[in-house]
């Protein structure tokens, strides 16, 4: 491929060669009649279309009979543009030929549709490779070529649309047809109908309705109608949509001098603080920023929202069940546009005009403990692993067995004891969770010297506590890892004769210290030391004592700056939150954060609370 590059534009030659060897897949557009198996004589207005939602670029319409949704791109139509700018463009409209104007607009619309839909399909393919097939639904390109059908769609949903969104319409001629995730798939209806036919559900009427002979088209349709009514008697279908927002932090020091972007008219009045407060409070440039909590106050000031919510994306992406439950409580109490609840594919709770109140949601829809059950179910779904961990454990055990077979017998015995102790302590620390692993000031974990019996008792108790956890085990990883906490307990006994009796205690204490420092994956192994290694260990202890004395004399601001670095909470590798977080970081981490000068004028010192409690947003001055 490199030999065929052009001398003038090598990049272009390579790009053309890649397109020739790896052509983009061709997607063909089909009409609704072909995709939904409708009669050719049926018109579009005979199909039930329900307005679902819309954003800045797309309209979403539901087809409840087919459990599908239409995603239609929207733009400012020529009719609305002419109505808004009729006076200003009157001279241009008279001078320009009418036929030329209409043909150019039609060509531009068709070109936009031809280019947009394949781009959407390619984007969906990329999302499938990044997130997985279990999180991304397939789509089909649907063609709506008739202008009368597009006009009817716009007029049919105009009354349900927000007034602020009426400046854009669906001008076609293409859209996307996707599954409606607010309803159970059609395979579930077939499964429930079969269960009712066998009498498994205990609904005799449903069983009788599902047995029909099915002779003829009319009888088959009647049987399906009876089955659907019987399925509905089993209960309602609820769907909860969450828009999590940005779930990662950005240090103020990584932003391009936010305080230099402050408007010249903004005057800051520093708060009077004592010397002790200045030492205890970290610098604003070293604290973490939460973009969502920052933008909430700006929206409140501009009148886009009526009240501040208590939701913070950091709680939802923390991986800690208690914090995730707090985030769900905040979303349910003040959903704004970040949470919506559907009942049988109908939107019943959200920020729309006809939404029910939170009291009605908690008393009528999800009364009593059902609301608690729903929130715990959401947390379990968000933290669910979409792989089988048993296979990985089996592979890891096979590899460890092969390594142990190759080692000598005495070393193998000591190594097995060390690995057992390290595994117990690591499982205990990971099971307790990040909220229960607290590091002292400076990020240094002080590991006490314990005996083998005490360490074994504590680690087994921690492991027993870990088994009572309801959700997936979560551990917290500090970005600043101090070497002293990890190496202070690595020094073995100076005498080689005492090593055989204390190897288990030393390994357990070492693993405990490392787990407290990193709260996660770091594994430590202790092997029998020679006299030369013992001497080197003694010299390392002396150097560590000297370094500790030097560290005590370090400025307090450096130690505090290390504590205020961003913390990354470890989520399960293949859960949906981790997938979303990876995608957010992939898109945004390489781009500088742009905050409006208006935001800085509202709050000169910035929103610098690492947890971003909403009640503190107004007190940041």
Swiss-Prot record:
Residues 87-108 have a biased composition (Basic and acidic residues). GO terms for cellular component: nucleus. Residues 397-416, 529-539 have a biased composition (Low complexity). GO terms for molecular function: ATP binding; inositol-1,3,4,5,6-pentakisphosphate 2-kinase activity. The keyword Nucleotide-binding applies. It catalyses: 1D-myo-inositol 1,3,4,5,6-pentakisphosphate + ATP = 1D-myo-inositol hexakisphosphate + ADP + H(+). Residues 209-221 have a biased composition (Gly residues). InterPro entries: Ins_P5_2-kin (IPR009286), IP5_2-K_N_lobe (IPR043001). It holds the Pfam family Ins_P5_2-kin. Residues 1-20, 87-111, 201-226, 391-416, 514-565 are annotated as: Disordered. One of its GO terms (biological process) is inositol phosphate biosynthetic process. A motif (EXKPK motif) lies at residues 241-245. The EXKPK motif is conserved in inositol-pentakisphosphate 2-kinases of both family 1 and 2. Belongs to the IPK1 type 2 family. This is Inositol-pentakisphosphate 2-kinase.
